[in-house]
């Protein structure tokens, strides 16, 4: 039986809001406006969490700045998904000792998935004495209280309760865009893929109530947001813990029926929980972007079993082919791991053949990175690093060729795009399927839906002109 999520009481959230007011008054009594910098590593869920951290900081009187130099408060939101991300965090946190030497009253906090690992917290505690506070993803809603305690006492604080499994509604948000918005619909993961640290640091799956999600989305539409992405470690499991009879496809449909001009997206999905009902829902509603990120990770059944993915190559292909059958324009993207422990050359060839069969629009490709505490980290891994790099290059070459061929097929066609910014002399936009389009135009077009005729392409983007 699914555990129901624990919703943080409004009284507790009101207390945190009051603390924000107290911090703001404390800074006002000192006669100046403090500044805060938030640095984010990792996935879109971390981006959404950082928006809430910025919201709490602004409610506490801080101006949000884009550099750590001179900031009164620095928050680093960390990622634990791969070793490279952790190495970068350690390096950058270490460098902050010099920044703090120039600004002794500066307060430095670390949060995010790395702080859900006890060995990491111990390392920070013992080797990074200039760090003032640590909190894991479950304690994010308590950040104002933690900040106030550090400001008042000057003592370090480590809030890493792992009993977790909560939902906190109504936390203030400072969004990074006034056009595109992240909306977290659930947190955590129950899948325990053998290589993945996420369930250990984010906790078990817990879903927000549909009425709370709809309330947030309605507010975004009213504020003029035109590209809304629903977030979860596995959105296809949405609602199982609520017992309301509302699944992810139902939630998507209820949002897609709201008035307004916007595109609705989602990530990430797990193939074992993806359904034809979800594909049918995407096909039915014009506001739902015809884009599906469906990670396959490997094209070989033995490797998939070792990964604890709970589906086969054939089951995955049936889903992918069904999506393309009912939506020929469906943009399919995916994640794939190269060099999983014990992967043979023949098993790697199965991955290449799956890529050729599905013909993904884009892939996010990774070489296996062992994560301490996961089953895969203990598996025998005889494949040399050089061989893994060679396979990685072959896979990237295969996908780059396919991506270019797909893009070449768009030359001469007219596509609907949402203009989202500028890079040097060109405007940038995204198609319904998430493809990057560059074209000449005036900044007044930013934020608008337009029809653009495609005149050229590269492997990674399209070039067009407004007719």
Task: List where the protein language model places each region.
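Terminal RNA-binding accessory module
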Residues: 1, 6, 378-467
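Proteins enriched for Cys/Gly/acidic motifs involved in redox and nucleic-acid/cofactor modification
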Residues: 1-238, 277, 292, 314-325, ...
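Radical SAM enzyme [4Fe-4S]-AdoMet core and its adjacent flexible, acidic
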Residues: 43, 239-256, 260, 307-310, ...
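Conserved SAM/AdoMet-binding glycine-rich loop
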Residues: 105-110, 117-119, 222-345, 356
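Short, hinge-like loop/turn segments at secondary-structure boundaries
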Residues: 126-128, 150-153, 246-248, 282-283, ...
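Glycine-centered loop/turn positions within well-structured domains
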Residues: 141, 191, 236, 301-302, ...
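Short flexible coil/turn linkers enriched for glycine and charged/polar residues
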Residues: 176-179, 189-191, 288, 298, ...
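Hydrophobic, well-ordered secondary-structure elements that form the walls
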Residues: 294, 335, 355, 363, ...
